């Protein structure tokens, strides 16, 4: 009986990628980011190991959604106290904390366990075009989230 080869975590190379979120669709962008964070784009993917890469997202303030989601999509947070639920639309949250929109979308696509929390720390989201990770020499990754017959 053959054994499944496991990747050696010491020799595993983790790259840094920069993704520009300007005029990209939120859900499709988050799907691609989650796949890279998990390492599903690599031949060495193992479900229970951290084989993914680091992702830097810039221009988070310019991410788009289709239809009426700009006004109708809501984000909820709760203080835990009676009557402490705060509801905020996509449009208002994008003006206030644009990074949180992409973080929320990607976090929902990662495993809900300790590995998922570890993978989430490898995501760096910035509202503007600048990021402080030049020392890691990130590779620019072009993602097209607008469908061919899209609007």
UniProtKB/Swiss-Prot annotation:
GO terms for molecular function: mRNA binding; structural constituent of ribosome. One of its GO terms (biological process) is translation. It holds the Pfam family Ribosomal_L13. GO terms for cellular component: cytosolic large ribosomal subunit. It comes from the Bacteria. Keywords: Ribonucleoprotein, Ribosomal protein. Belongs to the universal ribosomal protein uL13 family. Part of the 50S ribosomal subunit. This protein is one of the early assembly proteins of the 50S ribosomal subunit, although it is not seen to bind rRNA by itself. It is important during the early stages of 50S assembly. This is Large ribosomal subunit protein uL13. It comes from Microcystis aeruginosa (strain NIES-843 / IAM M-2473).
């Amino acid at each position: 009986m053959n054994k499944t080869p496991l990747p050696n975590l010491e020799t595993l190379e983790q790259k840094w990628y920069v993704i520009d979120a300007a005029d990209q669709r939120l859900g499709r962008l988050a799907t691609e980011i989650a796949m890279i964070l998990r390492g599903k784009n690599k031949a060495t993917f193992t479900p229970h190991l951290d084989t993914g890469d680091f992702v830097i997202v810039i221009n988070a303030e310019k991410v788009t959604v289709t239809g009426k989601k700009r006004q109708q999509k809501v984000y909820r947070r709760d203080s835990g106290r009676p009557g402490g639920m705060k509801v905020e639309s996509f449009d208002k949250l994008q003006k206030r904390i644009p990074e949180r929109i992409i973080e929320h979308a990607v976090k929902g696509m990662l495993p809900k366990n300790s590995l998922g929390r570890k993978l989430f720390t490898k995501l760096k989201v910035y509202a503007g075009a600048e990021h402080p990770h030049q020392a890691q020499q990130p590779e620019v990754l072009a993602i097209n989230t607008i469908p061919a017959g899209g609007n």
